[in-house]
Each structure stands twice: as structure tokens, then as C-alpha cells.
């Protein structure tokens, strides 16, 4: 293929965005995006979603034009402007840093939030433990974002920064307000309930960390290679025998145990909302595994062993 490539607006298919000449079939979608960005400065590479059909699936950056079945003389692609983009890593750092700042305000400065009612209030051990557990969780997330997760050049719409931060920061304030309140009601089963919840929380947190490390080691740096995730020598990774996304399983378990520890309705609501979203993500990844790997273990579920 060597010829002309016309790129139209995917939303207004009669709107010709740009015509590129001297196109070779060996050029990749990434190379085409770069050429478009050079002539249309507003359409940076990250904002472009190129497709063969206006409502078709976005093409991967490493796909070659010769593999798309296009005309060798005059080819047509469609582009959708994804809008201003922001790096995934930046969004993750912001959304996780917020709860690490918001929650301590309620714990360390209760009079600022609750007024004089907090001056003589006795802080229950569950409240103190919850503060350190919450802080550990989000400090771990920041550590993982900086040193464990691989993001490449992936981006997301800038609006996601507002949406994601609103979710995490808002829930941090919601949970913290009631857990640190001067009228906090201690767990019904006392220290046994608190320390049972703490033990489960700690195990789940390290389980989550273990899975993230395993997933990082599964894909060599600088490659797009994908392999079937399997347990390694760490016993916490054995959950891979039952679910495709044990990192989500451990994440949900952490918040279930946190909710047990503080016996707080806002914590339960936060846990439920998180599970609902992670279940959707897990099911999507589970379907992708089944589609990509013919020999993928059929007995695995997405997030809840034997159930979901």
C-alpha cells in the first residue's frame, strides 16, 4: 500500500480532517497519529482514536495499515477526538493522595471538625487503629503507583481526574467523619471484633500487594507481552487458582475487614460501592482472558471464588 489516506471525523463523517500523502502500508497507527498531530496541533497523539469505521473499535498503536484491508491507492480512516488527556499515573497519584490527607484531618484535628464536643471525648482504640489502617492502605497505593505499576504512555480524559478524586476524597471524608466522631459507638464484640478485623485487613493488604508484584513480573519491562497469571511461590497468590483478579478480591476483603473493625455504616457503603465497581472491572478482564487464551482455566471466576 502506497498512496493517500483521508482521515474523517468519526462523529461528523462528512468532515474531512486531514489528507496524508505518501502513505506506506508498513506504517503503524502510532506513526499515522504522529503525522496527524504534526499538522493538526490540537489533535495530539493521546487525543486520537483512529478507526476503520466511524463507530468501530479503536485501532491499536502497533497495528499496520497493510493489515487493515484498506485500499492501496486511497484509504479512509476515522478519528475521534478524545479531548484533553492526562497520564494514568498522575490521576492515580492525585486520587490516592487525597484520602491520605483528608482522613487525618478528622483524626488529628477533631475540634476543627466537631467543635468543643471533641475536647473531652475519649478516643476508642478502634478509632486509632482505623486511622493507621486507612493511612497504611493509601500509602501502599501511592508506593505501588510509583514503584510497582507500569503505565507506559496510557492516558485518560482530564475529566476523570475530577471524577476519580471526588469519589476517593469524598468517601474519605464520609467515612472519617463518622469513625472519628465523638459519639462513635464501639464495636459490639469489643476488642475481639477490632483485632479480628485488623488481622483480616493486614493479610488482605499484603495479599493485594503480592498480586500486584506478581502481575508486574508477569510482563517484562518495555513489552506488551501477556501471559496467563498463575500462583508463584507466595501462598497469598494461590487465590489465582480461583479468580482472575485476586488483587480486587483482596482489595474488597480489606475493606470488609475494615468495616468489621469499625462497625460503621459509611465504611460498609464505601466497601459496597468499591465492590460494585471492581466486579465490573474484574468481569471485563476475565472475559478478555478467556478470549485471548484458549487454554485459560475454565474453573476460575472473576472476583469471588465459585460465585462471580
Swiss-Prot record:
It is an enzyme of class 1 (oxidoreductase). Its main location: endoplasmic reticulum. GO terms for biological process: very long-chain fatty acid biosynthetic process. Keywords: Endoplasmic reticulum, Fatty acid biosynthesis, Fatty acid metabolism, Lipid biosynthesis, Lipid metabolism, Membrane, NADP, Oxidoreductase, Transmembrane, Transmembrane helix. Its EC number is 1.3.1.93. The chain crosses the membrane at residues 112-132, 169-189, 194-214, 255-275. It is found in: Endoplasmic reticulum membrane. GO terms for cellular component: endoplasmic reticulum membrane. It comes from the Eukaryota. One of its GO terms (molecular function) is very-long-chain enoyl-CoA reductase activity. Residues 7-85 form the Ubiquitin-like domain. It is a multi-pass membrane protein. Pathway: Lipid metabolism; fatty acid biosynthesis. Pfam families: Steroid_dh, TECR_N. InterPro entries: 3-oxo-5_a-steroid_4-DH_C, SRD5A/TECR, TECR-like_N, Ubiquitin-like_dom, Ubiquitin-like_domsf. PANTHER family: 3-OXO-5-ALPHA-STEROID 4-DEHYDROGENASE (PTHR10556), VERY-LONG-CHAIN ENOYL-COA REDUCTASE (PTHR10556:SF28). Catalyzes the last of the four reactions of the long-chain fatty acids elongation cycle. This endoplasmic reticulum-bound enzymatic process, allows the addition of 2 carbons to the chain of long- and very long-chain fatty acids/VLCFAs per cycle. This enzyme reduces the trans-2,3-enoyl-CoA fatty acid intermediate to an acyl-CoA that can be further elongated by entering a new cycle of elongation. Thereby, it participates in the production of VLCFAs of different chain lengths that are involved in multiple biological processes as precursors of membrane lipids and lipid mediators. This is Probable very-long-chain enoyl-CoA reductase art-1. It comes from Caenorhabditis elegans.
Amino acid at each position: 500500500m502506497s498512496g493517500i489516506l483521508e482521515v474523517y471525523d468519526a462523529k461528523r463523517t462528512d468532515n474531512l480532517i486531514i489528507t496524508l500523502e505518501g502513505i506506506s502500508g508498513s506504517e503503524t497507527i502510532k506513526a499515522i497519529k504522529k503525522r496527524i498531530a504534526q499538522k493538526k496541533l490540537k489533535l495530539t497523539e493521546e487525543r486520537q482514536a483512529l478507526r476503520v469505521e466511524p463507530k468501530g473499535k479503536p485501532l491499536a498503536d502497533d497495528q499496520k495499515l497493510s493489515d487493515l484491508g484498506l485500499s492501496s491507492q486511497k484509504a479512509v480512516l476515522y478519528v475521534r477526538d478524545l479531548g484533553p488527556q492526562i497520564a494514568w499515573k498522575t490521576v492515580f497519584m492525585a486520587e490516592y493522595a487525597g484520602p491520605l490527607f483528608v482522613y487525618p484531618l478528622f483524626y488529628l484535628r477533631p475540634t476543627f471538625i466537631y467543635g468543643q464536643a471533641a475536647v473531652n471525648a475519649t478516643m476508642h482504640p478502634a478509632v486509632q487503629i482505623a486511622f493507621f489502617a486507612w493511612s497504611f492502605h493509601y500509602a501502599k497505593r501511592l508506593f505501588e503507583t510509583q514503584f510497582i505499576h507500569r503505565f507506559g504512555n496510557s492516558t485518560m480524559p482530564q475529566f476523570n481526574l475530577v471524577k476519580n478524586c471526588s469519589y476517593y476524597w469524598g468517601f474519605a471524608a464520609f467515612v472519617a467523619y463518622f469513625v472519628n466522631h465523638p459519639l462513635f459507638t464501639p464495636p459490639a464484640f469489643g476488642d475481639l471484633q477490632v483485632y479480628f478485623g485488623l488481622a483480616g485487613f493486614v493479610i488482605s493488604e499484603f495479599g493485594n500487594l503480592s498480586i500486584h508484584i506478581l502481575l508486574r513480573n508477569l510482563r517484562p519491562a518495555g513489552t506488551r507481552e501477556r501471559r496467563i497469571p498463575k500462583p508463584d511461590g507466595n501462598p497469598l497468590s494461590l487465590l489465582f487458582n480461583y479468580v482472575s483478579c485476586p488483587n480486587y478480591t483482596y482489595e474488597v476483603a480489606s475493606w470488609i475487614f475494615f468495616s468489621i473493625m469499625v462497625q460503621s455504616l459509611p465504611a460498609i457503603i464505601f466497601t459496597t460501592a468499591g465492590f460494585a465497581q471492581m466486579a465490573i472491572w474484574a468481569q471485563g478482564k476475565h472475559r478478555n482472558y478467556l478470549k485471548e487464551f484458549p487454554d485459560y482455566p475454565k474453573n476460575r471466576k472473576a472476583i469471588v471464588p465459585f460465585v462471580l
